[in-house]
Amino acid sequence: MMQLPILPQNNVTVATPGTDPMIDPETGKPRGRYAVVSLGCPKNLVDTEQMLGRLDADGYRMVDSVDGADFVVVNTCGFIDSARDESMAAIDEMLALKRDGKLRNVVVTGCLAERQQDKLLQARPDIDALVGVFGRNDIVSVVDELYSGLQEQRTIFKPAAVNPLSDAMRSAVTPRHFAYLKISEGCDRLCTFCAIPKMRGKHFSKPIEQIIDEAKRLGDSGVREVVIVAQDTTYYGMDRYGEPRLNQLLKELDKIESIDWIRLMYFYPMYIDDALIDTLASARRIVPYIDMPLQHASDKMLKRMARKTTRSLQTDIVQKLRSRIDSLVMRTTMITGFPGETEEDFVELMDFVQESRFENLGVFTYSIEEDTPAARLPNRVDPEVAARRRDDLMELQQQIAFDWNDSRVGGTEEVLIDAEMPEQDNVFIGRTRSEAPDVDGLIYVSQVDPDSPVEVGQIRPCEIVASQGYDLVAAAT
């Protein structure tokens, strides 16, 4: 899970000297200064950006620290125990500042707010407003009412949307050269361990033309890499068109000249057919990278998880993707300690990972989610056993990842430069086509030729000169 430093946007109005900084002289509306804490997945980050866009358009001014803020928006994650703990810690930190008189209001939004609703207000009565996932379009009215002197707590919880919410009105908080693009909301999968459908509702897809318009806007604003996200990317279109339409969408996205890289996240093994693989293999802008969370490899565990797949089917799809897409890099996630997992099941998982050799892999220990079928399953696994299995799996994956990075030394790869290295002259941080933002390794790039400066946002050919575990060292050519 990530907590992002949210920086002020360049297009906000700055108070004129001698005027009340809380009133916009042009609109007469209240204009408070606000800070944001954004937690959780990239899909939640897009929601954060959408709320910021609405606040900015209404005259509120974002600042880069809570020290200079009148109010704070905490956009929470409620996915697993560790995410909930992180969200509660962030809320408590902001409420402490409010009690000390350093913040006027604390607004809590997102998945934890949606999941707990009144329980959260009972536990933290100092929260001024609670906004659920589908109330985010009303963030301005919530803040306006707080500034008008409303004393009661404000809550906005709406039913899951049946039409997609537009993300066009966004204030980007990622570096300007990459952005996440959400193509759908919610999920129709009924995985027994997962509470996302309870927080995000059923799957609904944006129209293709709306996604293309949002992508073009991103490209025209200077975005070089667009990262496609959804709860279930390959299910795109089923609700709207009656059949999967990811293939058609990707063909249209691949035509956008202003975008260099398109990256695909959250693939589900179902609906990956030959036509889609052909598109992935032949596209000019879609990078050879697929994030496909598989969760397990034991048929017994997959059945108990209601994944509607088998180890054999997963092996077949991994092999087919690798054989058809040149230089494909794959990322997946696994769960250890799911109820009923035996040592034999775990050995099957280890064997599958050894066989598949995913370049990037994350592991979670099972987290009990209230009101999910898995929470009622017998044969709970001891948390220490689940943690030991996680560590064993990560030790195996570490060797696979390190071997893969070692094999890249001496080659030349294009690197998207994300940032300057703090306190080191002429050293930069970037990623190749093989690394997604926030979750994969980094490339440390040295500028060798002073007459050919490296700049943030460039896609720069670099020679890989050394491996440092999960990360690489490179020299700009």
From Swiss-Prot:
Species this protein is from: Rhodopirellula baltica (strain DSM 10527 / NCIMB 13988 / SH1)
UniProt lineage: Bacteria, Pseudomonadati, Planctomycetota, Planctomycetia, Pirellulales
Gene for this chain: rimO
Cellular component annotations (GO), alphabetically ordered: cytosol
Known catalytic reactions: L-aspartate(89)-[ribosomal protein uS12]-hydrogen + (sulfur carrier)-SH + AH2 + 2 S-adenosyl-L-methionine = 3-methylsulfanyl-L-aspartate(89)-[ribosomal protein uS12]-hydrogen + (sulfur carrier)-H + 5'-deoxyadenosine + L-methionine + A + S-adenosyl-L-homocysteine + 2 H(+)
Annotated MTTase N-terminal domain residues: 32-148
Positions contributing to [4Fe-4S] cluster 1 binding: C41, C77, C111
Protein's name according to its UniProt entry: Ribosomal protein uS12 methylthiotransferase RimO
Residues annotated for [4Fe-4S] cluster 2 binding in this entry: C187, C191, C194
Function: Catalyzes the methylthiolation of an aspartic acid residue of ribosomal protein uS12.
NCBIfam families named in the record: 30S ribosomal protein S12 methylthiotransferase RimO, MiaB/RimO family radical SAM methylthiotransferase
